[in-house]
Amino acid sequence: IKTFGEGATAILAQSIGGGGGFVGASKDGVALGGETQSNITAGDVTVTNSSLIQTTGKASAGLIAQSIGGGGGVVSITESEKISFGGSGLINADAGSVKVKNTGNIATAGITSPLIMVQSIGGGGGFTTTSDQTPALSKTNLIRLGDISSQRSKAGSINVENSGTLFSSGRSSSA
């Protein structure tokens, strides 16, 4: 699997209960997540990869696997004013377990392009990237990660098995 260009993640597997998803870019406000919801459950996520994965663009992860109860997801921003990233007033917003088994080689070259990202998040959160052109935050700019006044939300277990070679050359691009 090879991708080129900004925000071009190779594999994105998500189970999100009550909101979230993937937003490539926005010039205006962005809101990801549920509000005033109860008993939201995201399912389990399992990814098995044996292929070669290569990405070259900014904010282009190799593999992302997420189970997020009640909000969150993936946002890649180049120009943004307001971002609300998570839930509000969520009750029992539970995430499932996430399992990744990778035997393939993964290489990313862009900035903020993690090789493998695995998350189980109850009630909000996720992954946000910004570019070098993103304006500095001021009173009119806002980035909020996480949930507000959520109750009894919990995350599931995470299991990652990797026997492939991982290589990242971009700034802020972790394994």
Report each predicted region and the residues it spans.
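Low-complexity, glycine- and small/polar-enriched segments
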Residues: 1-175
